[in-house]
A protein has these predicted regions:
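Beta-strand secondary-structure signal
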Residues: 26, 71, 149, 180-182, ...
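Carrier-protein-dependent adenylate-forming modules in NRPS/ANL systems
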Residues: 35, 45, 95-96, 125, ...
Length: 216
């Protein structure tokens, strides 16, 4: 834990200008575009979620270092028995994901590296992200904030396990979050939202940052 990197350190404006309000940037891929990504990911042995997670990490790394930690919102419905999937409730949990991006690595290698780390984390979800942040703070002797979030609900509705963990029209309101990248599949299309806290970044950063995600 003591060797885990901090959150991405993007250029920010003065703290006195920060407000607890978010703006939303949205985008969408067509059914054909999204199906092509899903099929390509499957052929390479990676998940579509990890593809988009890697794109998000790469975008942040353009304004930060290649080594940082991200806050992942996970659907964590324990397999106690078959009846668990009939229960309506909040089964989301947090994972703090280590990211180490080498500038000379090819894209598929970066995806596989992130996927390996994520799968390793999932094997230890009893010690979730909240516990990790608390332990890092204890070891480093400081309050730790991982305000860059990635939230995926890909395939949740298809699997019939939940109604989804993302509300397409509901903007993030959590003050400990700077950017929440949300992805979901709706009627065969990919919908993605970026909820960005106002007063954290200058407009000169926000537009290129989101555009790099859209165009990658």
């Amino acid at each position: 834990v003591k060797h885990m990197p901090y959150a991405p350190r993007l250029p920010m404006i003065e703290e006195s200008n920060r407000i607890n309000r978010f703006i939303r940037k949205t985008g969408q891929l067509s059914c054909e575009e999204w199906k092509n990504i899903e099929e390509t990911a499957k052929n390479y042995g990676v998940t579509a979620t990890c593809v988009l997670l890697t794109v998000y990490a790469l975008c942040l790394s353009k304004w930060s270092s290649p080594d940082f930690s991200l806050n992942l919102t996970m659907l964590n419905r324990p397999n106690i028995n078959d009846e668990i999937h009939k229960i309506v409730g909040d089964f989301t949990s947090v994972d703090i994901l280590e990211v180490h991006l080498g500038y000379r690595e090819i894209f598929i290698d970066q995806i596989k590296m992130i996927q390996r780390q994520l799968f390793s984390d999932l094997d230890h979800m009893e010690f979730n992200g909240v516990n990790v942040i608390r332990e890092i703070g204890h070891v480093k002797g400081e309050n730790i904030l991982i305000p860059y979030v990635f939230t995926s609900s890909l395939g949740i509705k298809k699997a019939g396990k939940a109604r989804g963990i993302i509300m397409p029209d509901g903007i993030s309101q959590t003050p400990q979050v700077y950017i929440d990248c949300q992805i979901m599949d709706i009627e065969g299309k990919l919908q993605y939202n970026w909820d960005i806290r106002e007063g954290i970044f200058s407009p000169e950063i926000i537009e290129p940052l989101f555009s790099s995600f859209c165009n990658t």
